[in-house]
Amino acid sequence: MDNITHSLVGVALADLAMGRRGTKAQRPLFVGVGVVAANLPDLDLAYSRITPPPIGYLLHHRGHTHTVVGLVALALMLGFAYRFLPSVRKMRPSGQLRFWLLMAIALASHLLLDSLNSYGVHPFYPIDNAWYFGDSLFILEPSLWLILGVAAAWNGRTRAARLAAALPMAILLCTIASTGEIPLESVIALAIAGALFAWITFRLSSHTRAAAALAVVTMIVAGFIGTSRLARRAVVDALAPELRGQTVDVILTPNASSPLCWAVIAIELREADGEYVLWRGTLSVQRAWKAPADCASHQFRGPRDGRIVGDGRLALRDVVHQPLRRLRTLADRDCWARAWLRFGRAPVMEGESIFDLRFSDRPGREFSDMRLIAREGCPPNVPNWGMPRADLLR
């Protein structure tokens, strides 16, 4: 997830951890550690260049610091840094307990949130080096910003603090709405939900308001997770008559603040034909409310209309055929490509490039693109993550 979401979760957890006994003087300390801990796993960006690009960013971001073992190490490091602060040492034992629990939960929240989208994490390394993909949330989710932002604004101790929390969120939400990436009905729903939440929680205490915000956010996330399961089944059923081989993966990404609309990439292995096929389209979970053609977003830069398959909820926009032999040869003989395949989930080879269809529909447009050219030596410091597409390489 984006760092705005991580930070707002850290603020809400801090207000919740303070409880009724927290003082005005303690809030900056609690909020500070909540925000720092909620973002600290992204410290891996600082050392991603120990491996040349693009491999360094692909393999080190969401790398070791996004594992359970890494979180323990970060907790010890952050705890050591805060332990000697006079303001922490002067706390009562109950206050210190809440402070350390806040730090631990905020750290864990980062891994939990990052596990919910199609980018993936590998939390159980080194015991298990496999990637886990939640396929349930877009990396930017304005509904989470709205609820958590309202709580953060109301919980500000002064009018200036409330304005400082509310104004950037309002500008950000309006900017995103103006791009057209969020459909009009979602913009209206967000505005109503934000106003309703602000009205309901206006007279609540800070920690109760934070608890309410976290509860609403949990329900939103649960709704996306549940809809993701429905979307996956709908994709499998719709594509069944089209497929000649084995479906090895279904990649799902919802449109921002629109759980009815999903970007879909299904990967089919056709061993007998010596190829794998990537089926790319848009799905409307409920076509009576939203047609697949109306679900187009920034993720599809081609024509809005696609071939409708199945029961009418899935519109296919691209069918990309890829040679298995070339992919397997690259994995066997090119150590740079083999390192890239420790990240790539939807690999597409076009000309002298390889890129991930999750992030672009052509080479040279985004961070996963890598040129397939002769290089001296192999990339250094390549972590031993599992290959998402090992099922195509066997």
Which residues make up each language-model segment?
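N-terminal membrane-targeting hydrophobic helices
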Residues: 1-243, 251-254
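Extracytosolic and intramembrane catalytic regions of membrane-associated proteins
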Residues: 244-250, 254-394
